[in-house]
Amino acid sequence: MNTTVSSRAESLLPIAGVAIFFLAFAGQGVRNIFGWLGFGIITALVLLACWVVFFLAGRRVTLRRISLSVSSFIVLCCLSVIWSQYRLETFASALITLATSSAGILVAIAFPLRQMLKVFMDAMKIVVVLSYVLELWVSLFVGHRIPPMYMRHWKEVPELYYWINDSLFRGGPIQGFVGNRNPLAFIALLLLLCVLVFWIQDRNQHIRNLLWVCACVGILILTGSATVFVAMLVSLSALVFLLIIRHLGFYERRFAVRVALTAAASFLLVAVVMKDQVTEILGRSSDMTGRGVIWAKLLELSAEH
């Protein structure tokens, strides 16, 4: 392969990785702009371009680098088209699963772990910035909530379909570019953890890292996601624990791990026993805001198969 072509493709790999992570985590925002058909075309073109860059950069996919358990699950998902009662929808879902899985393989092979995390962070930073910009634009210049672009001419837009609710200056909850507060909060949490890990490890760029931490915390506050709040407490506790045990000896680590597992099991037991009190503190109902109803409906649908 031409060395010049290979080196250029190598330089484009991080951009390809950012595009994949962006579409994977913020695809709803792209879909809100271009609609389902436009989103499908954009995703297909981006995925094709990324694979071309992947091969031109000299990367190769070998069977030994593909997880047997994951690939078996993907095959099972695709085979479910055979016995599904909704074959068209299941076939579309199978195609999406294959596309998503191929993108994951591309990213996993193309980058070492540290570089992959940096590429991931770049994509999540774009999502966070776009979310703030979009929320500000709607609150300052539009003055009312907006639906996805392809729904602008609908006579009636369902309540849950609105993209931005113009709630930034009312304290939230905001939905950002992704159009859903829970995924947006999850993105902010992942970015926060990555920034903290790199900040602790590298100990540089203090002002920049502090700004990103503030941006992520702002998203977490404005989204008000109870699920992500719990995940944040668990993640930060795990991060602090790992930072502590890295300075301990072998036997001290074993003891610390046992203490941590015991504490985690105790907290979990208390949370289960005092479920009503815990959900009340989080400002949610005992079935976590209708999730019991959702699962009941899903079980009804599963009975049709």
Where are these regions (language model features)?
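Transmembrane signal-anchor hairpin modules in multi-pass inner-membrane enzymes, especially those
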Residues: 1-79, 115
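Alpha-helical transmembrane segments of multi-pass inner-membrane proteins
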Residues: 121-224, 228-243
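Membrane-interfacial entry segments at the cytosolic side of transmembrane helices
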Residues: 114-123, 204-210, 247-262
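Structural signal for the C-terminal ends of transmembrane alpha-helices
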Residues: 47-60, 106-116, 194-203, 237-248
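TM-adjacent membrane-interface loops and short helices in multi-pass inner/ER membrane proteins
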Residues: 292-305
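Membrane-embedded alpha-helical segments of multi-pass membrane proteins
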Residues: 37-53, 94-103, 183-191, 230-237
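A membrane-periplasm/extracellular boundary helix in multi-pass inner-membrane enzymes
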Residues: 133, 137-142, 240-286
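Transmembrane alpha-helical segments and their membrane-water interfaces
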Residues: 85-139
